[in-house]
Amino acid sequence: MSNAKNTSAASPARKGHSHHDPASDEFRKEDFPFYWLARVHGRYTQNMERLLKKIDLDVPRWRVLWILNENGESSISEISTHAIAKLSTITKIVYRMKEDGLVDTAPSPEDGRVTQVRITEVGLQNIERMQEVTRELFQRSFKGLTEAQVQRLNRMLEVVFHNLETL
């Protein structure tokens, strides 16, 4: 066996030429969509936590209230699916919210093992308060983008989301 073969066998094979593929020699983090998704999510979460703290709420409660506001009465499992969170995590959040009077729970009439959650009047009042304190953040987030661009961004992110379901 020649020395050249041993050297080439020990060295990694030439990788692709994509700036957005971390396995590529040409990779640049600024061209990697997940780099920007992580940064946007981090900044968004920091801002949301800061704003919601003013009204004694947090992002998990905000998420549950919005899911219930949009979907109406939902099971804890359905909330977990929409929130992309573990069932045990959402269960804890829902029961803390129940203690705070934001939601009510009841067994499902169809299946007593399923817990249904509905928003209370206090929860609805908190949605109004959440809208007031976060309005500027959402307006500023999409400044410089047209409605069509925001819709296109949503469609592209939805495709990526569904692509990741099959892993």
UniProtKB/Swiss-Prot annotation:
GO terms for molecular function: DNA binding; DNA-binding transcription factor activity. Exposure to indole-3-acetic acid (IAA) probably relieves the repressor activity. PANTHER family: MARR FAMILY REGULATORY PROTEIN, TRANSCRIPTIONAL REGULATOR, MARR FAMILY. Residues 1-10 have a biased composition (Polar residues). SUPFAM superfamilies: Winged helix' DNA-binding domain. It comes from Pseudomonas putida. Probably acts as a repressor of iacA expression. The keyword Repressor applies. This is HTH-type transcriptional repressor IacR. Residues 1-25 are annotated as: Disordered. Residues 30-162 form the HTH marR-type domain. One of its GO terms (biological process) is response to stress. The keyword Transcription regulation applies. Transformation of P.putida KT2440, which cannot degrade IAA, with the iac gene cluster confers the ability to grow on IAA as a sole source of carbon and energy, but not the ability to chemotaxis towards IAA. Residues 76-99 bind DNA. Transmembrane segments: none annotated.
